[in-house]
Amino acid sequence: MAVTVSTNVSAMTAQRYLNKATNELNTSMERLSSGHKINSAKDDAAGLQISNRLTAQSRGLDVAMRNANDGISIAQTAEGAMNEATSVMQRMRDLAIQSSNGTNSPAERQAINEESMALVDELNRIAETTSFGGRRLLNGSFGEAAFQIGASSGEAMIMGLTSIRADDTRMGGVTFFSEVGKGKDWGVDPTKADLKITLPGMGEDEDGNVDDLEININAKAGDDIEELATYINGQSDMINASVSEDGKLQIFVAHPNVQGDISISGGLASELGLSDEPVRTSVQDIDMTTVQGSQNAISVLDSALKYVDSQRADLGAKQNRLSHSINNLANIQENVDASNSRIKDTDFAKETTQMTKAQILQQAGTSILAQAKQLPNSAMSLLQ
């Protein structure tokens, strides 16, 4: 081996390995201090791209869970208000039944009606003041809202809220009033026993297309006016018949989803003088000062309660769906974060071993470099 002083190959080699050990030590210290084994694209370009994509998905899932919880909160707020509205209308129904009793005087019915009117005001107050985050929920202004319950576009759920104001036509129906009263001695004429009520857009034709729904009733011959009302009530849950004190028949038809004008026809309709121009009746229009009005109020309130109950059922289903969505989102986020951790996070057991190895190599390299720098001094002994 040649002895030279201009080029110290041994020192250069020792310095190269020392630099390598120092770089490895710095990398290990960076990974241990940051907690991530990928701190820049040079560490793992492909891994960084995958990790960033998983991070975006995880953060999106976190926001989606908050959105779903907001949806549950809105549904709970609206459903709680509807529960109170139901209690109000149940009380009004009790009053209507009480007012229908023949023992009540006009003054007593007037007092009952005043309480009913106060409850109508309370129902409207509930509808107008129930809000969430500044948005009114039950006065008809909310409409439909989309709740983003996923980390990607298109993963939304639509929630709709409708009005429960007392003057909403869906909170009631229409009433056909008879112009001719019948006494106890009257009986259904078998030649005029047919009655047909047509509800536009509530049925289907043979091809499954939207069509009118026809409720055909053939009354029993000889039935008096009260027996006729009882018979009509048993034919469909969409209609309710009652009789006033003067023997006049009134038929109430609930129509929350009817599109168009409801009509009535048939021999019985002509016999009783049932007008083909029904009166639209909502909770706002209830009048309990007469037996006829009280009887009609019962039917209107039954329709309104059914309508509100259907809205509450829909909100309950939405809440359950959102709860399951949150559980699913949490499960997805857990697995996404676990995958991201395997790609990006530092394995401390492995990295501390690497750091210890790099420290030893750095110390050894420093010592060897110091010795290698002394090798040219051996040339001086040849000059002595």
From Swiss-Prot:
Record keywords, A-Z: Bacterial flagellum, Coiled coil, Secreted
A family per Pfam: Flagellin_C
GO-annotated molecular function: structural molecule activity
Signal peptide: none
Keyword Secreted recorded: yes
SUPFAM superfamilies: Phase 1 flagellin
Top-level taxonomic group: Bacteria
Function of the molecule: Flagellin is the subunit protein which polymerizes to form the filaments of bacterial flagella. FlaC is not essential for polar flagellar synthesis and swimming motility. Homomer of FlaC is not able to form a functional filament.
Similarity section: Belongs to the bacterial flagellin family.
Subunit structure: Heteromer of multiple flagellin subunits including FlaA, FlaB/D, FlaC, FlaE and FlaF. Homomer of FlaC is not able to form a functional filament.
Name the record gives this protein: Polar flagellin C
Gene assigned in the entry: flaC
